[in-house]
From Swiss-Prot:
TM helices/strands, residue ranges: 12-32, 53-73
NCBIfam families assigned to the protein according to its UniProt record, in alphabetical order: Ced_CedA1 (NF041797)
UniProt membrane topology term: Multi-pass membrane protein
Cell membrane among keywords: yes
GO CC, any one term: plasma membrane
Subcellular location: Cell membrane
InterPro entries: CedA1_arc
Listed name of the protein: DNA import protein CedA1
Induction of the gene: Up-regulated upon UV stress.
Quaternary structure note: Forms a complex composed of CedA, CedA1 and CedA2.
Organism: Sulfolobus acidocaldarius (strain ATCC 33909 / DSM 639 / JCM 8929 / NBRC 15157 / NCIMB 11770)
Alphabetical UniProt keywords: Cell membrane, Membrane, Transmembrane, Transmembrane helix, Transport
Purpose of the protein: Part of the Ced system, which is involved in DNA import.
């Protein structure tokens, strides 16, 4: 296994896990926010999950771009 393939495998694995967690948090957040439970605290918890998921998706997009840039540079150097 070369350094380039290791970086590419690590990048794709981390990115897949990150997007999966984003989708899970997004779904749970909307389920809690839209639930017919009359407890405001639960609905606010869903709203907080949604806000955190959006921020995480932004940083995940930036981070995956940086990872792929590093992978590209490593493949050009090797």
């Amino acid at each position: 296994m070369t350094l380039v393939t290791f970086i590419e495998n690590l990048t794709s694995t981390v990115t897949e896990i990150g997007w999966s967690l984003f989708i899970l948090a997004w779904a749970i957040g909307w389920a809690l926010r839209g639930s017919p439970i009359p407890i405001f605290r639960i609905k606010r918890g869903g709203q907080d999950l949604l806000e955190d998921a959006i921020i995480a998706a932004f940083f995940l997009a930036i981070g995956s771009t940086i990872f792929y840039l590093i992978s590209y540079i490593a493949s050009q150097v090797s």
